[in-house]
C-alpha cells in the first residue's frame, strides 16, 4: 500500500521527536521511577477493569470486550492486539480514536478537578489514557508533561500487549 508506506516513513522522525523531550528529562525518570511504573501499570489495569465492568453491565460479548481492551494504546499496536485476540479491528480503531480525542479534550479539566498539578503525573495520565493524541496535549502543557506522556505511550502499549491475552479470558 503506497499511502501506508508514506505514513510509515513519517513515523520514524515523529518517534525520534517524542524521544528528545524524554531524553532531556531523563533525570526526572530516574527520580520518579517507582511512581512512573506504578502510575502506568495502574492506568493500564484500571482501563482493563473498567472495560470488563462496562461489558458485563451492558451484556457485551467476548468479541466486544477484546475489541475495546486496546482503546488506550496507539492505533498501530491496538490493531494488532485486537486482531490477535479475536476483536473487531475497525471498532478498535474507532475506540482508540475516540479515546484519544476525548482525552485531549477533557483531560486537562479532569486533572484540574482531581487537583493533579504535578507535571510528571499529568504527562503519565495523558500518555497512559489518551496515547499519541493525549501526548500532543501534554507537549502543549510543557516539556516534562510531554516527556512523561511519550514514555507512558510505550510502556502502556507493552503492558497492554502482555495483559490482553490474560484479561481476555475473563469474559
Regions found by a protein language model. Give the residues of each.
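Transmembrane helix-loop junctions in multi-pass membrane proteins
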Residues: 1, 21-29, 57, 86, ...
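Alpha-helical membrane segments and immediately flanking helix-loop junctions
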Residues: 64-91, 97-98, 113, 117-155
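Hydrophobic alpha-helical transmembrane segments of multi-pass membrane proteins
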Residues: 7-10, 37-45, 93-98, 121, ...
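Transmembrane alpha-helical segments of multi-pass membrane transport proteins and ion-pumping complexes
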Residues: 13-21, 40, 44-56, 75-79, ...
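Helix-coil boundary and interhelical linker segments in multi-pass alpha-helical membrane proteins
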Residues: 52-64, 83-91, 168-171
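Alpha-helical transmembrane segments with an aromatic anchor "belt"
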Residues: 32-41, 57-68
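C-terminal ends of transmembrane helices
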Residues: 18-31, 107-115, 134-141
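Helical membrane-embedded segments and adjacent short helical loop/helix-boundary regions
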Residues: 1-20, 28, 32-35, 39, ...
Amino acid at each position: 500500500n503506497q499511502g501506508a508506506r508514506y505514513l510509515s516513513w513519517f513515523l520514524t522522525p515523529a518517534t525520534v521527536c517524542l524521544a528528545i523531550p524524554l531524553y532531556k528529562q531523563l533525570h526526572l525518570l530516574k527520580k520518579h521511577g517507582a511512581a512512573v511504573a506504578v502510575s502506568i501499570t495502574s492506568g493500564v489495569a484500571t482501563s482493563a477493569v473498567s472495560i470488563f465492568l462496562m461489558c458485563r453491565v451492558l451484556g457485551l460479548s467476548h468479541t466486544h470486550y477484546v475489541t475495546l481492551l486496546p482503546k488506550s494504546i496507539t492505533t498501530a499496536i491496538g490493531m494488532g492486539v485486537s486482531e490477535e485476540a479475536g476483536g473487531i479491528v475497525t471498532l478498535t480503531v474507532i475506540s482508540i480514536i475516540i479515546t484519544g480525542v476525548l482525552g485531549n479534550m477533557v483531560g486537562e479539566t479532569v486533572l484540574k478537578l482531581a487537583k493533579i498539578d504535578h507535571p510528571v503525573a499529568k504527562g503519565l495520565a495523558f500518555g497512559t489514557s489518551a496515547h499519541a493524541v493525549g501526548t500532543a496535549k501534554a507537549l502543549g502543557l510543557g516539556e516534562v508533561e510531554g516527556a512523561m506522556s511519550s514514555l507512558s505511550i510505550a510502556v502502556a502499549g507493552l503492558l497492554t500487549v502482555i495483559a490482553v491475552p490474560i484479561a481476555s479470558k475473563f469474559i
